[in-house]
Structure formats: structure tokens, C-alpha cells
Amino acid sequence: MLTLTHICTVSYEVRSTFLFISVLEFAVGFLTNAFISLVNFWDVVKRQPLSNSDCVLLCLSISRLFLHGLLFLSAIQLTHFQKLSEPLNHSYQVILMLWMIANQANLWLAACLSLLYCSKLIRFSHTFLICLASWVSRKISQMLLGIILCSCICTVLCVWCFFGRLHFTVTTVLFMNNNTRLNWQIKDLNLFYSFLFCYLWSVPPFLLFLVSSGMLTVSLGRHMRTMKVYTRDSRDPSLEAHIKALKSLVSFFCFFVISSCAAFISVPLLILWHDKIGVMVCVGIMAACPSGHAAVLISGNAKLRRAVTTILLWAQSSLKVRADHMADSRTLC
């Protein structure tokens, strides 16, 4: 039998601080990922061909816009609508379900990016691996469509699992003679089972990401040993490409593990222990991780860095023109 601890009330100051931090995280995450999306989308508008990596980054940034929006809605629900002494309301459960699906799509896209780096950077010697790398490079658009299809399938299965257990809850209520406490526990456990189901579907892309990232790491080590033997030039383009790719992949791995741990810990905090402060901390960590990886992607991509430099130069020149105009106005006065 499940035993629930006492419900921790949250002061107005804590809720206000959490909401302020959530607004900042949403603003930073939205701006960074919208920047990546707009830079790549502008190339599409100008009818310039997008590289495979740019296509993946475009899809990845769009999926993270949804992630940040859902996490911000979750923060609003926690601070204003959801009382942990009551069962989770329907709107909050829908937000959590959509977040699980968007997070899984994000993982599939990261696995696709890792495979793309492998196909471009690793020099394979086996015929099968050479053909596989060539196939990945040629079929990247189909892989992206496949990711969307897998996300849709996962959505249907998660919704089926969730509402199927909801039917079990309704049937249970009829036979429990209005035992509301047990009904609340079963309703909350429905979300937990759906959460576990989504995480099981995340195992294949996560393993794919780990294998391809491991192959890229081995390739980097082999390339560095070759450089020590045959050349003294430390500025090798292939080496720099390896390092930049690994930085983006390792940073994603770290941020994803941290975010997943926070999400997993938040479930018992939300359902069993009703610790709203703990849930707020977990939501804050989950919102910060995609923003951090977006910053790493911008710093490691030459086109995005050039766009940032252009924007900063434009802002600097605009401020200078405005300051000169104000100085001229004062002189005339």
C-alpha cells in the first residue's frame, strides 16, 4: 500500500522566484533555438541548399522550441493551478505527456546528428561500413521523416497506454465505493506507467547515439596517433572537425543525462511525496539543459557564429549611430 508524506506548502516568495527563473530560462532557450532555426530557415528562403547537418540542426532547434514551451506551461501549472494535495489535473497531465514525446523526438534527432558526424568524419576500411556511411549521407532527409513518423507512433502508443489505464481507473472507482484516496493514487500511477513506457522507447535512439559517438571517439584517437607519427602540424582540419563534433555530442550526452535524471526524480516527487519545491527544482534543471546545448551548437558552428558576429556588429553600429545623433542634438541645443 502506498503511503504519502505530508504535503509541503510553498510560499508566495518561492513561487514568484521559480516563475521568474522559468521566464528567464524560457526566454534564453527560445531565443537561442529560434536563432538557430531562423538562420537555417533564411537559407531556405534565399533558396540556398542546406547541408545535412544544417537540416538536422533545424529540426532539432524546432523540437526544442516545443520543449521550452511545454516546460514553461508546466511551470505556470505548478505555480498557479496544480495543487499537489489533489490529483493531477487533465491539462497538466497532457503537458507532461507532450513533453515526453517531444523529448524523445529530440533524442532521435541527436542520434541522427551523431550518425551524420560518423558518416562524414570517420574513415572506414570495411566495405560494409563504407556503404553504410554513404547510405546515411544520402538518406538523411528520409531519416528525418522516419524520426517524425516514430514520434507520431510513440504519441499514439503513449496516449493509448495512458487512456487505457484511465479506463481501468474508472472501472476501479465503480467497485471501490467512492474511495477517493485510492482513486487519486491510481490516477497518478497511470502517468508514471506512461512515463516508463516512453522511456523504454527512448532506449534504441540512446544506444544508437552512444555507439556512433563511441565510434567517433575511437576515430579521433586513431587520427591523433596518426598525426603524431606523420605530421607536426597541429592545425589539421579533420582533427578540428572531430573535436567540434565530439564537443556537441558529449555536451548533449551530459545535458540529456542530467535532464533525464531530473525528469525521473520529479515523478515520485510529484506523485508520491507531493514535494512541490523538489518538482520546481527538477523542472528548472530540465529547462536549462536544452539552452546549454543550443549555446554549444552555436559556438561550434561556423555559419551560426558568423550570424552572431553580424548581429553584434549591427547592434554596435546602431548604438553608435544613435549615440552620435543624440550628441549632435545636444550640440544644436
Swiss-Prot record:
Keyword Ubl conjugation: no
Signal peptide boundaries: none
General function of this protein: Receptor that may play a role in the perception of bitterness and is gustducin-linked. May play a role in sensing the chemical composition of the gastrointestinal content. The activity of this receptor may stimulate alpha gustducin, mediate PLC-beta-2 activation and lead to the gating of TRPM5.
Membrane topology: Multi-pass membrane protein
Organism of provenance: Papio hamadryas (Hamadryas baboon)
Lineage: superkingdom: Eukaryota
Name of this protein: Taste receptor type 2 member 38
A Pfam cross-reference name: TAS2R
PANTHER family found in the cross-reference section: TASTE RECEPTOR TYPE 2 (PTHR11394), TASTE RECEPTOR TYPE 2 MEMBER 38 (PTHR11394:SF52)
Main location: membrane
Residue runs in coiled coils: none
Lineage of origin: Eukaryota, Metazoa, Chordata, Craniata, Vertebrata
Cystine pairs: none
Extracellular-side segments: 1-17, 77-94, 164-190, 273-276
Subcellular localization: Membrane
Residues of this chain annotated as glycosylated in UniProt: 178
